[in-house]
């Protein structure tokens, strides 16, 4: 009627550390049940709004002495602990308010595709922030580095994967 159109700004690389998917679909995220660095501590404020989970940033975030690569989630009922990696493009510090999606998981890829399609049905224009990190070469470089390379994200070298295995797990560029 007035010629106004809305655009959506979507970040398909990661979610917020307190996003619904973090609680409802923990398998969508790059996480592990131990801290990537034994010296990391998580004694700061609980940032969770979910009554079932506690979410804490690594303490060095607050005193600015290190760039924490994970945050800790603790289930208040079972005591289960997960260390979830923050989003990162490998060029600067981790994005400490984010949780990194695991694109090696085909269920995650499909969930993101469906979310993109949902947004596309509601907005004529979509801006994708951090979209370059969805390319296979960046997923490999950042999160599943080749053996012996160390990778661009601290704490991920032990998750290295040879090219053949990586290509088997992500056979094609899923986002095209």
Where is each model-derived feature located?
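Hydrophobic faces of well-ordered beta-strands that scaffold small-molecule active sites
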Residues: 6-8, 126
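Aromatic-lined substrate-binding rim segments of carbohydrate-active enzymes
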Residues: 1-6, 144
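Alpha-amylase-like alpha-glycosidases and glucanotransferases acting on alpha-linked glucans and related
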Residues: 16-176
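Short "lid" loop at the C-terminus of a central beta-strand within the Rossmann-like core
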Residues: 12-14
């Amino acid at each position: 009627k007035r010629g106004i159109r809305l655009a959506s700004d979507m970040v398909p690389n990661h979610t917020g550390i307190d996003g619904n998917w973090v609680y409802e679909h923990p398998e969508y995220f790059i996480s592990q049940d131990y801290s990537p660095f034994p010296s990391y501590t998580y004694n700061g404020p609980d940032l969770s709004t979910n009554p079932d989970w506690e979410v804490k940033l690594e303490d060095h975030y607050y005193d600015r002495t290190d760039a924490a690569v994970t945050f800790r989630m603790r289930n208040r009922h079972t005591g289960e602990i997960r260390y979830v990696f923050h989003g990162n493009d490998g060029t600067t510090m981790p994005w400490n308010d984010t949780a990194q999606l695991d694109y090696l998981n085909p269920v995650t890829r499909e969930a993101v595709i469906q979310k993109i399609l949902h947004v596309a049905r509601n907005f004529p224009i979509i801006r994708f922030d951090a979209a370059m990190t969805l390319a296979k070469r960046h997923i490999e470089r950042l999160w599943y580095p080749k053996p012996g390379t160390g990778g661009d994200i601290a704490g991920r070298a032990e998750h290295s994967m040879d090219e053949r295995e990586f290509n088997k797990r992500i056979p094609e560029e899923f986002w095209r």
